Amino acid sequence: MLLQRLDFLLPYTVKRLTPADVDEILALQAKHSEYHQHYQTSPVTKADILAELETLPPKALPEQKFYLGFYAQDELVVLVDLVLDHPQANCAWLGLVMTEKTKLRQHYATKVLTALRSALKREGYKELMTSSALSDVNAQAFLNAQGFEQGMVTAVYDPKLGHDIQVVLRGIEL
């Protein structure tokens, strides 16, 4: 039902992405080296994308995860990684929102997040949560502009970097 709501609310086509879409996802993500430098020491690879498509938070089930692509005229313009009922019931976790580099500052991600919040609210969700690297000033500014309230800053071990990174937990009521 979530996909149908998003399809209705947006001027974009919404698709649940799978490993068959790895090349398209990689093409979009590879243009965002400044984002990936906060989380890994090397450029993003197909293997990274395939792992991201399957990675679940603790206690989450595969059917809770939605790795979504939003298309404008057959072009992938926004990626969203969403986990429903995580970290608790009636809460959704936003793992990633990323816009095609050539479409930045054209409000694609803002439109997607606005529709996502509306769709989640209609589905009975109460809160949308996320986190981002404290060092990622672009993500911090974007989340501030979207109305996400800043929560606590905590250290999280990042296995790709081999050390802890400081992340900011954030949430927004739906």
PLM feature spans:
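Short glycine/proline-centered loop/turn elements that form peptide/ligand docking sites
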Residues: 113, 137-138, 158-161
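Acetyl-CoA-dependent GNAT
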Residues: 2-12, 16-22, 27-102, 113-115, ...
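Conserved GNAT acetyl-CoA-binding A-motif
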Residues: 121-132
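Short amphipathic helical patch at the helix-1/turn junction of helix-turn-helix
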Residues: 79, 133-134
